[in-house]
């Protein structure tokens, strides 16, 4: 079929504590990110569209449109994380990427009472009846690599 579920992963809203949070304070509500804070965000390399920040709490969902905000907008996850760790603003990044930086104190969670919907990860490959052993081994390795970060019911 050419697609395999890898994991369902969480997304963390983070900022650099020693510069960004110390200077600007933590946002009190997701809506404050639209008016009072610098944002590190993503844009689509295909469409140029800036992705909103998404928040959920107790059945309430807020989509924060950050297109008009000051900040940095990138289309690559390592650049995004680097911008966060450099103190350029508040952003949402995959939990598995943020984990070591949160553990070391380089990043802190902001708006911890709000979560972002879980994000599915998939691996896509050319479908073939005669799938090579190398491809199967690679796909299995990727699934195994992400298993510790899988928040789905499969765990």
Over which residues does each language-model region extend?
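Single conserved hydrophobic/aromatic residue that forms the stacking wall/gate
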Residues: 1-14
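Flexible hinge/capping segments at coil-to-helix
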Residues: 12-40
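Small-molecule pocket liners
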Residues: 13-19, 37, 53, 62, ...
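Short loop->beta-strand "edge-of-pocket" segments that line small-molecule binding or catalytic clefts
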Residues: 30-56
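Alpha-helical segments flanking ligand/cofactor-binding loops in enzyme cores
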Residues: 31, 81-82, 136
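Hydrophobic hinge/microswitch elements
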Residues: 61-109, 116
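C-terminal effector-binding regulatory domain of bacterial HTH transcription factors
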Residues: 95-100, 104, 114-155
């Amino acid at each position: 079929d050419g697609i395999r579920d890898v994991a369902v992963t969480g997304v963390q809203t983070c900022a650099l504590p020693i510069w960004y949070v110390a200077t600007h304070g933590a946002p009190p509500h997701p809506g404050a990110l639209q008016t009072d804070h610098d944002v590190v965000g993503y844009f689509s390399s295909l469409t140029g569209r800036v992705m909103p920040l998404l928040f959920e709490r107790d059945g309430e969902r807020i989509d924060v449109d950050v297109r008009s905000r000051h900040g940095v907008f990138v289309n690559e996850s390592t650049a995004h994380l680097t911008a966060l760790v450099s103190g350029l603003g508040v952003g949402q990044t995959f939990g598995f990427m943020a984990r070591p930086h949160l553990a070391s104190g380089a990043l802190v969670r902001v708006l911890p009472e709000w979560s972002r919907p879980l994000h599915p990860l998939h691996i896509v490959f050319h479908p073939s009846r005669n799938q090579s052993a190398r491809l199967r081994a690679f796909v299995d390795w990727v699934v195994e690599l992400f298993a510790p970060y899988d928040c789905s019911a499969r765990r």
